[in-house]
Amino acid sequence: MKNIFIINGGQTFAHSGGTFNKTITNWTKDVLESENFEIRISNVNDDFDANQEAENFKWADVVVYHFPVWWFQVPNRLKFYIDEVFTAGHNNGIYKSDGRSRVNPAINYGTGGLMHGKHYFVTTSWNAPETAFTLEGEFFNQHSVDEGVLFGFHRMNAFTGMKSLGSFHFHDMEKQATQERIDNYEIEYKNYLKNALRNVNAEVLN
């Protein structure tokens, strides 16, 4: 495993400048360069060729997504990017079909992906504090990010055949974005990413 494709979904929109996700992208790049991975990076704010982006998915051993959560969904530019690129990847390395046959269409939905053997990793950034997910009576009713807001996102990647390499979530990045917290997050995130990459390398070697 050596090829890593990073997608910076930190869209510039309204009061959001995408600055923090650019920072996370640079942290990821630092880790990958120190481990001698081959890297490609796309930014959803840039114009793109959907066919070339589909080639990036096909080239990658691991796809890394970085994005803020807006209104409990991915930013609109990232959704547009995924729609365009995954359509370009139909019968072209990303997915073939929904996996079902007309003989028994009740079963095997979601098994038509073409990216088996590949992994993905995701980070999200939030205004919401972590306690909004963990404390009884708080907004997300004790549903985690991955089991709640990102459930569909994870299923999307599973549809292509990719396996999750893990996720890391940055909370309270509006009201509590102190330099100390950001510095601590950098250390924690880089260690988490290094361990995740070691785990997938061990899986590949086995």
Which residues are covered by each model-predicted region?
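A short, charged/proline- and glycine-enriched loop
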Residues: 1-2, 117
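N-terminal beta1-alpha1 ligand-phosphate binding loop
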Residues: 2-35, 188
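Glycine-rich phosphate/pyrophosphate-binding loop and the adjoining helix
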Residues: 21, 139-206
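A structural motif corresponding to the C-terminal end of an alpha-helix
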Residues: 31-37, 112, 118, 156-165
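A short beta-strand-loop structural module common to alpha/beta enzyme folds
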Residues: 35-48, 168-171
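Helix-loop-strand module that forms the ligand-binding subsite of alpha/beta enzymes
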Residues: 51-153
